[in-house]
Amino acid sequence: MAFRASGPAYQPLAPAASPARARVPAVAWIGVGAIVGAFALVAALVLVPPRSSWGLSPCDSGWQEFNAGCVAWDPTPVEHEQAVGGCSAPATLIPRAAAKHLAALTRVQAERSSGYWWVNGDGIRTCLRLVDSVSGIDEFFEELAIRICYYPRSPGGFVRFVTSIRNALGLP
């Protein structure tokens, strides 16, 4: 006599989950790994190099650093047209604020001088008198003045991002 069951021989306690839903897809793990890896890379770039490596780029050959810019000059006085055309791109004539600051720094030599500097006047003929750092338009200066070329240096967006994170974390 054979044993025969009246119902199914095996009844699962819970319905079977499909194997595709039970596991996290490999694509998701790759995505999470890429995000974590990118975060670790940015963290290493921010934390490992010293602050000095995130500074401004050096000035080109023949140029002197001046605050956040670079300056070059020719001590021979020239006319305005020569001064404007004598600065190679991306440099222009020194802006008025930077010229006043430079004049204040060189005031010791300037007190004995009655010279003038051409300054960037956005197309208007403008100069700065060295003795008292007064600037003007065709009012009091001679036809000749010294040309000082200037170009600003600014850090890129990623450098500003890194330095802001380092500042927020209080890192030196």
Swiss-Prot record:
Residue ranges, Intravirion side: 1-27
Membrane topology listed for this record: Single-pass type II membrane protein
Alphabetical list of InterPro entries matching this protein: Herpes_UL45
Major localisation: virion
Top-level taxon in the UniProt lineage: Viruses
Location(s), subcellular: Virion membrane
The family this protein is said to belong to: Belongs to the herpesviridae HHV-1 UL45 family.
Function statement: Important virulence factor of HSV neurotropism. Seems to be required for glycoprotein B-induced fusion. Dispensable for growth in vitro.
Name assigned to this protein: Envelope protein UL45
Species in which this protein is naturally found: Human herpesvirus 2 (strain HG52)
Phylogenetic placement of the source organism: Viruses, Duplodnaviria, Heunggongvirae, Peploviricota, Herviviricetes
